[in-house]
Amino acid sequence: ALTYRGVDWSSVVVEERAGVSYKNTNGNAQPLENILAANGVNTVRQRVWVNPADGNYNLDYNIAIAKRAKAAGLGVYIDFHYSDTWADPAHQTMPAGWPSDIDNLSWKLYNYTLDAANKLQNAGIQPTIVSIGNEIRAGLLWPTGRTENWANIARLLHSAAWGIKDSSLSPKPKIMIHLDNGWDWGTQNWWYTNVLKQGTLELSDFDMMGVSFYPFYSSSATLSALKSSLDNMAKTWNKEIAVVETNWPISCPNPRYSFPSDVKNIPFSPEGQTTFITNVANIVSSVSRGVGLFYWEPAWIHNANLGSSCADNTMFSQSGQALSSLSVFQRI
């Protein structure tokens, strides 16, 4: 079994405030954390935004839901976006008021990370994993940390890692770097080779490499390409490896891109979700030091397309009832 069998549940309180009542597969209302735990989930992933306008996904929001997760026996994986909003390959907007020169920005990032980690510890939350940035293939904290300036990226990540290492968190979490397109070895190799050759970010600064792996953004995102890429990553850097975001649709009438060849026979249904997640988990398990799989936001039913061209990638019905696919976490 994988060490980390997880889901991202960041939007749980947003949905509860919108009136969603989550139900288990039998139709009985229960807190989402209990439904997840009963279906084999052992870790929840949570995105942290620095100062979002409405407060959703800020540190206080995350501490509140992390306490619920901990009470349900779940581990917590904190995903720092280092932005006031979404951070991904198309968006890495520096938080409002942060300095843009590299010296002051490095200190700001270190101190922000240190302070957030200490606040988690003081609240009784000891995350098992902390990601320093989210999908940072194109860098982080733009414009200073764009890939045109690898030296800045290396310095920023070193500062973030040491914010965790110097914190009062005990025990210390695994520190992760997270890129998208986990199937693309060329991209992973280009990125890590460039950032590590700067000499500032050391291999000892981090423990895990996380990747996103979605089937609906490129026909090149085959399961076989994922396996090859993760095998190469493990062989080259000897880090723990996890697929930290993935989805499979229960409805996808008008996909924008052709699906990868080796998943085309998988149906768009809860049964298909079970098959796809099992296949991805088997690949991670087959990789040296492959340790985890996280499904992205399976309970965000008011945003069911989850940013894709597929109509619904969640593992809950629109009325909030868990689908049969949620139990896949008992078997990976």
Curated annotation (Swiss-Prot):
Misc. remarks from the entry: Has a pH range of 5.5-8.5 with optimum of 7.0; and a temperature optimum of 65 degrees Celsius at pH 6.5.
Positions glycosylated per UniProt: 111
EC assignment: 3.2.1.89
Originating species: Thermothelomyces thermophilus (Myceliophthora thermophila)
Keyword Transferase in record: no
Coiled-coil ranges per UniProt: none
UniProt catalytic activity: The enzyme specifically hydrolyzes (1->4)-beta-D-galactosidic linkages in type I arabinogalactans
Active-site residues (renumbered): 135 (proton donor), 245 (nucleophile)
Annotated GO MF terms: arabinogalactan endo-1,4-beta-galactosidase activity; glucosidase activity; hydrolase activity, hydrolyzing O-glycosyl compounds; polysaccharide binding
Highest taxon of source: Eukaryota
EC main group: hydrolase
UniProt entry keywords in alphabetical sequence: Glycoprotein, Glycosidase, Hydrolase
Family stated for the protein in its record: Belongs to the glycosyl hydrolase 53 family.
Upper classification of the organism: Eukaryota, Fungi, Dikarya, Ascomycota, Pezizomycotina
Gene Ontology terms describing biological process: cell wall macromolecule catabolic process; pectin catabolic process
Protein's name in the database: Arabinogalactan endo-beta-1,4-galactanase
